[in-house]
Amino acid sequence: MATVPVKTTMSSAQSTDRFVRESGIAASVASVIEPVIESLGFRLVRIQVSGKEPRIVQIMTERPDGTINIDDCEKISKQLSPVLDVDEPFSGAYRLEVSSPGIDRPLVRPSDFEDWSGHEAKIELSEPVDGRKRFKGVLEGFEDGEVRILAELGEGDPQHLGFPVALIAEARLVLTDELIREALNRAKKKHSGRPGDGAEMDEDDVADLED
């Protein structure tokens, strides 16, 4: 199976831009709330809107360093609710849920593939490559505009593949023991490095990671 070729250069700013975008009502919500989230010092990961009355509006967000806690989620929720009430990207009642991306997180930025290189992921393409849309394997980062993965293809040895971001419809980490350990270790290090924080994570921090 051949790598899908694309040659682009990407700045560090572009590497943190989301390339996975919502559609429909979720896209309308994103256009309203993303500037608010960024003004609070966080970044949007993913939005999902489900149900009818009330609609469930699920928002995944995080700090630029990948962390977030329950207090952060409550702060963001309080800021977003009045914005949604005023701008009304949809009609009717809704319930707002703000959370972390979780350990088996969606991968929505080029930097996500770099940050979690070496861990397993599932990737779904918007159109088939060599007759298939779904791939699973070990992330090998992001290079020349492509997501790199050592893919398991059923028979034979895994193959090094690359997919341009324009083809990525969905990408998510696979929950493994190694991923859980790595995520918790990273969170502890970042938590202990913040001014005014102790070296230990509390139960809320761990719960946020596991959501």
PLM region descriptions:
Residues 1-173, 177-211:
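Short Lys/Arg-rich amphipathic alpha-helical segments
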